[in-house]
Amino acid sequence: MVTADSTTDIPELFRQATAQGQAKQYDSAARLFERAFTLDPDGPLADKSLFESAEMYDVDGKHEEALSRYEQVARRFPSSDLDRVARVRALRLLTYLEHYERAGELADLTAAKYKDLLSFDQLAVLSARALSRVAADDDTQAELAIGKARDIIERESLDGAGRVPAELAPVYFALGELRRVRAERIHFVPVPASFGAALEQRCQLLLDAQSAYSDAMRAYDSHWSAMAGYRVGELYQKLHEELMQVPAPKAADTERRRQLFEGAMRLRYSILLDKAKSMLDHTVAMADRTGEQSPWVLKSRQARDAIIQATQAEQAALARLPYTREQLQAALDSFSAGHVPP
């Protein structure tokens, strides 16, 4: 084929691009494949050239570039043998890049078109659907998608002891997200009629969410691990923040009793900041070790710094109070029992 700017025929250009890819010169290979597609966008190698361009960008870590080309394959070549795999890869990238609304839309279209998806492809569809539904506050549909994904995982025995396949990370992350948003719907201001029951329910959901996020980390994917680690730290930090806003009870009717209540609350729940910092320390250390540089790592560093400052403020506030830890604990026990501390 002769063009205005090249005398290289398409098969030869395709071979050159393939050689570049095999030599791990992925960016160069991607550009050559894309040139082959551009020169002959309706030719016999058009769909494969565009797909290979996407794949080269994908392995080179250029996710947005890869995503746009996978999506283009699906749009331009819906009858191609590459359509199915292009859709699944686009789904994984949409989920990875947190484009959850688009991921949900593509998941529904893909599931409607292909009724015989393989297990891992089904997991890509279901995790994308679940995350899009969580983002839309649709608990019912999110839980349904996660349940179907977990059924596949169990049926195929995909989750054994230790490391799990990378395809499971978004499923478990979605489960963590669902449990997280349910936990954070439980508030303590105004003080609920049964404060103890509300706190117990939120703590249980927090622990359940942490368990799911921990399962996501078992894929040993630094991106998903950073996201999950940040979320766990955030769960503890937010719970502490909200508990510190709980107003003093009516029994705290003097300045001394209000000080006792404030100090007792700070003392009892300071452990939440310790747990948050521990998880964020772990997340930042993982990022340093693996070279992960996603926005979630920056958020983890910033959150850790904020928690260090909050911990110092808590310690200073406790030090200013003219009471021992034993006195504060006794006061909190009295308030919790509905009694007035002396």
Where would I find each of the regions flagged by the language model?
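Acidic, polar-rich low-complexity tracts and alpha-helical solenoid repeat scaffolds
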Residues: 1-342
